[in-house]
Amino acid sequence: LGMEGIMLVSALVTFVVDLKTGSKVLALIGAMMAAGALSGLHGFVCISLRGNQIASGLALALFGTGLSGLFGDTLIGSTVTSLNRIPIPGLELIPIFGSAFFNQDWLVYLSYVLVAGLWFMLFHTNWGLQIRSVGEAPNVCDALGLSVAKIRYLCVIFGGMLIGLGGAYFPLVLTSFWVDDLTAGRGWIAVALVIFAFWHPGKALWGAYLFGAAIAFQLQAQVMGLKIPSYILEMFPYLLTIVVLTVVTVRNRRAGQTFMPAALGLPFFRGEKH
C-alpha cells in the first residue's frame, strides 16, 4: 500500500541526482537506495515490531507524497534529458504489438529480464521455494531452521528497490521536468496490479500492459479530440482498475480459489500456526 509514496520519493531522488550529476545510472542507484530504505523502515514496523501492515503502508504513502511535494517545489522549472528509445530491428515492425514491446527504452527491456528472472527464481529454485513458503506457512519454515524475519526483510527491501525503478521511470522517460504528484496515482494502480496478477510476475507483465493501455487511451482520446468529457477520460484507468478487481474477486470466490499468500499481512510469532 505504500508504493505510491515510495515511487514519488524515488522519482524525486532520481530527478535531483540526474539534475546535479547528469548520470542516469547514479540517478537509478539513488532511487533504488531511497526506495530500499523506505521499504526497510516499513519492514521494521511490520516484521520486527509486528505492526499493522495496512496502517504502515498507508502512512508510508502519505509520507512519501508529502515529502516529494515539500522538496519538489524547489525543482519546478528545472528539466533533465529523457532516455531515448532503442528499437529492435524487425521486431518493432510486428503489427499492433511491435512498437509497444520492441520500440522502448532500455529500462523497459530490463523489466522483461527482471520478470523472467523473478519467475525462474520463484518457481524453479530453492530460494524461491523458501520465499513462497514464508508467505504461505512461516511456521514450517521456522521449524526447518530458516529465518522467517531475514527472508521477509530481504524480500521487502528488494521489492522496494524494484518499486524505486518504477518511480525513477517517470522523470527519466515519461517527463523531463518536475511536477507535483508526478506519479499521478500509478502506485495505487500497481497495488491493484499485484492482486490482478495473482502474485505472479509473468501475469503482472501482461497486466501492466493492460493498465498501461488504459492510460494511453486516456491520453490519445484527448489528442484525437473525441467527444468524451475530460473527467471521464481522467478516471478511466482507475475505473478499469476497480472493474478488473471486482471481476477477479467475484470469479475467485465462485471458484472457491484464492491466490493470496496465506500468511500475507500476518505478523509472525515463533511457535504460532497460521
Where would I find each of the regions flagged by the language model?
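Transmembrane alpha-helical segments in multi-pass inner-membrane proteins
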Residues: L174-Y238
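Cytosolic-side transmembrane-helix boundaries in multi-pass membrane proteins
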Residues: E136-A143, S147-K150, A221-H274
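Alpha-helical transmembrane segments within multi-pass membrane transporters and channels
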Residues: G22-L67, I215
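Membrane-interface helix caps of multi-pass small-molecule transporters
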Residues: V16, K20, A37-G40, F44-S48, ...
